[in-house]
Amino acid sequence: PMKLYNLKDHNEQVSFAQAVTQGLGKHQGLFFPHDLPEFSLTEIDEMLQQDFVSRSAKILSAFIGDEIPQGVLQERIGNAFTFPAPVSKVQDDVGCLELFHGPTLAFKDFGGRFMAQMLTHIAGDKPVTILTATSGDTGAAVAHAFYGLPNVKVVILYPRGKISPLQEKLFCTLGGNIETVAIDGDFDACQALVKQAFDDEELKAALGLNSANSINISRLLAQICYYFEAVAQLPQEARNQLVISVPSGNFGDLTAGLLAKSLGLPIKRFIAATNANDTVPRFLQDGNWSPKATQATLSNAMDVSQPNNWPRVEELFRRKTWRLNELGYAAVDDETTKETMRELKAIGYTSEPHAAIAYRALRDQLQAGEYGLFLGTAHPAKFKESVEEILQETLPLPKELADRADLPLLSHNLPADFAALRKLMMG
């Protein structure tokens, strides 16, 4: 069975089920796999010919082992990955791995849906309550991932009036086992309420509380799968010269890509692309870890100055004896992001700020004879207002958003007060 250890205390070892259920270890430490499996070149070639779901089952059972039988795992992955991850041609030597074809039009659908399948499988008949705070994207992905699953209730807190109306419609119109709560306060106030709930042992035990945090190991494992799916779509000559540029905020996507490489997937090198929140690029340049105050940018999902997955990146490099100076990096400011979006539009590809940053870093660093992929982490319509303004054109709403636009909001309004939240949750 799979063993994982806490990066802050290597003595704390847990099973896959424990890591999924707990999320974090003590001292808020991240869990990391004890064994790093590797496939042979022959196995990789065979896997690249499989379909997305069967291949993903093989990848994930290499990590999870017999803790979940491969047949069950494959069925659960089939429930999670119900949409494609196509590589869209942008230029002769560049493609975009589009991760926004799921129900909430963002890459988080992969991790969120697989995590939901794992949590409900592990919990069995025991009731589970997912409690999480969101500033938009994560909430939508979590809500849709758990919607309609048995024995699980989801409570999502968000700052009232501080997320886009479009995003609010995406997850506050579901009902059923999804409770959405608009809090009078900012995102930090929502986070504080979540923390209070997890400190309340009685509430935790009564409801089987779980955070479904983006740091959950099941999300990270799910994200490895789409790197294989990307390579499977490339011609042989591109596979041997592949450079992947990853838009980076919390660095989960980059961690997953590096794990794919560590499994044996042929990736020549990675580029970590950030916005003005450039803690990692500065660190890779001069070796000093010195986060600054977070700056608001166009690519707001990457407005992170202390990326919480970075310890996993460092651990993987240490374990594989890779050198950090082999990692490419770039920080792209808002002005350049806008120019790049217009440049992409001119060659026929409509993009949004996060993908544009990854493309910019890739284009600037791609060498002759190499093939480049950049990750498209969200549908341009998720950033409709800014994309329309920058590109001076109207974006049609994709079906997923249009279908929900006229539905009534089902949210409760609450003050930023734990007693009120507790009453609602116990009710």
Q: What are the roles of these predicted feature ranges?
A:
Residues 1-427:
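PLP-dependent amino-acid enzyme catalytic core
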